[in-house]
Amino acid sequence: MAPWLQLCSFFFTVNACLNGSQLAVAAGGSGRARGADTCGWRGVGPASRNSGLHNITFRYDNCTTYLNPGGKHAIADAQNITISQYACHDQVAVTILWSPGALGIEFLKGFRVILEELKSEGRQCQQLILKDPKQLNSSFRRTGMESQPFLNMKFETDYFVKIVPFPSIKNESNYHPFFFRTRACDLLLQPDNLACKPFWKPRNLNISQHGSDMHVSFDHAPQNFGFRGFHVLYKLKHEGPFRRRTCRQDQNTETTSCLLQNVSPGDYIIELVDDSNTTRKAAQYVVKSVQSPWAGPIRAVAITVPLVVISAFATLFTVMCRKKQQENIYSHLDEESPESSTYAAALPRDRLRPQPKVFLCYSNKDGQNHMNVVQCFAYFLQDFCGCEVALDLWEDFSLCREGQREWAIQKIHESQFIIVVCSKGMKYFVDKKNFRHKGGSRGEAQGEFFLVAVAAIAEKLRQAKQSSSAALRKFIAVYFDYSCEGDVPCSLDLSTKYKLMDHLPELCAHLHSGEQEVLGQHPGHSSRRNYFRSKSGRSLYVAICNMHQFIDEEPDWFEKQFIPFQHPPVRYQEPVLEKFDSGLVLNDVISKPGPESDFCRKVEACVLGAAGPADSYSYLESQHVGLDQDTEAQPSCDSAPALQPLLHAVKAGSPSEMPRDSGIYDSSVPSSELSLPLMEGLSPDQIETSSLTESVSSSSGLGEEDPPTLPSKLLASGVSREHGCHSHTDELQALAPL
């Protein structure tokens, strides 16, 4: 403390001892009675209650009104300063009393009363202004002045007060302070008052969060404080009133805990108060949001369920659209007409007629798609054309494993008609076998089932030619529109040839040639319009579309699989087929007839050696072994010497040369999107044996035959012309994949 403050405090103590009676009188009796009268704030009051000069009044405020304290004259310090202490709301309140000095009293307009704590920066200020300003004289120098009460002061604390008159030429620092000390609590209040007991705050106030609950713990107050319980007041920082939670003190422990349940997240203000409201400690705590253990699964379900529902609706919509699209394809074929009703009425009677027996022969070297077409065609012949079809895929493989040749010869003998499905693989391997049938060693493909069957059929065909021309009607060679007539082996040239599905009516009429009187009753039974009347016809349509798609994706699939090249292939321009003929005419639209070569322009390269046929033949004999001697040699085409296997190159025809598309193979409907419908109306034996369609054909397991390796010197050999295929030497410069 500064020396001058210590000196002032000493003089104040001496003055208080000497003038104690005066201070007691100024206090106005008991502190409680005095406080009851003077704790209120007075706006306007008389200058003194004892002077009798009621014509002098002051207006009080808290120094908010700024008046220029500077003046032209000096005004003396206040005289006879006394302090009146009393209790207001269990705290100290003081009132300052003084008298004005005689010097400069005529210039006095008011006083400023400034109260400060000696060891603190806290400051309170009051301002007294004459309500009716007028000039005072020396007769007012004994008039007592009184300030408003100064409230909320501390017990036993040192203060000083300055009374500054204005306007004065002297500054505030030129006026002397008056020091005093507030009285003890037990002097102003009753000794048993709780406000006079020692002040206590808990040393530790711990706040923690457990889920959505808030846990508050603190240490106990000593027993002499007499606290019976505590209250926890809490609220959000920007909320209104406090919420209260009572905490019972446990005497057996050193701490007391309170649990605040279901507290919402936010920034909280927490206050700890005892039951007498004399102890208070505040703290702040941020409650964080807690994620429920069910929040994750609930969120996942909330996201998954709508997605599943949307996906289900999207899938259903897609399926319905595709079904509608397929229905649109067949809708114009399913219109009610006298023809369809006639067909529906005639179908049961057709079932009762004897069914012609048909033996179906095919090549298993053209891939699975071609085998699917063959199998669907067999179903179609049985279901739509009313035939009894013999197909190796439908036979019990375990029973005919060792007797395939005998089974084929038996079926050829028993059948009324023999249908050979010609394809590129059939042409290649049959002609290759015929070309080298004179070889002495066993070939790799000499035991293929279809080679044995074709050899037997060719022998029967040659015998039928010698007997009568009517016997040739038993032998039929068919090819689908992804092949051409040039794919018919030379050994089957004497057979009747049909292109499917263009010549479907003619094929059905051929199969039922002995029943012309029955077919004449319903001529539309086997028309191309009725092609789609049965599920087997639609299944055949899908299988043909899949084969077309496979050829479009890999035009050179056959060459890649069976004709390995030793030299890099010569660059050539791949043919572009704008459309392919579906073989169908919808809504009875008649297509313009044209030669077969307009659709399928094939070049048949009969590779011969530069020195002549004998040299090339001997070279091929050295490269590949011939078939077994048991296999009968078949005659080659009459138009050419012994031919090597033929390779076909497709020439892209001009738009005028291309046949008109009948529209049944709609490019807007990819064949990959169509499914094979189940076959109905089949006999139980055929349904049972049809389960073998996915197994290896009866010709598998007997080995495959590698095609001959063609040397580069034979690439520029002559070109042989055969029935149905035209040679173009200027377009085929080298052997290349299709």
From Swiss-Prot:
Question: Where is it localised?
Answer: Golgi apparatus membrane; Cell membrane
- Cytoplasmic topological domain residue ranges: 321-738
Glycosylated residues (UniProt): N19, N55, N62, N80, N137, N171, N206, N277
Q: Which GO terms describe its molecular function?
A: interleukin-17 receptor activity
The entry's keywords: Cell membrane, Glycoprotein, Golgi apparatus, Membrane, Receptor, Signal, Transmembrane, Transmembrane helix
Q: Name one GO cellular component term.
A: Golgi membrane
Name the membrane topology term.
Single-pass type I membrane protein
What is the role of this chain?
A: Feedback inhibitor of fibroblast growth factor mediated Ras-MAPK signaling and ERK activation. Regulates the nuclear ERK signaling pathway by spatially blocking nuclear translocation of activated ERK. Mediates JNK activation and may be involved in apoptosis. May inhibit FGF-induced FGFR1 tyrosine phosphorylation. Might have a role in the early stages of fate specification of GnRH-secreting neurons. Inhibits TGFB-induced epithelial-to-mesenchymal transition in lens epithelial cells.
Q: What is its quaternary makeup?
A: Self-associates. Interacts with FGFR2 and phosphorylated MAP2K1 or MAP2K2. Associates with a MAP2K1/2-MAPK1/3 complex. Interacts with FGFR1 and MAP3K7.
Q: What is the recorded name of this protein?
A: Interleukin-17 receptor D
**Organism the protein comes from:** Mus musculus (Mouse)
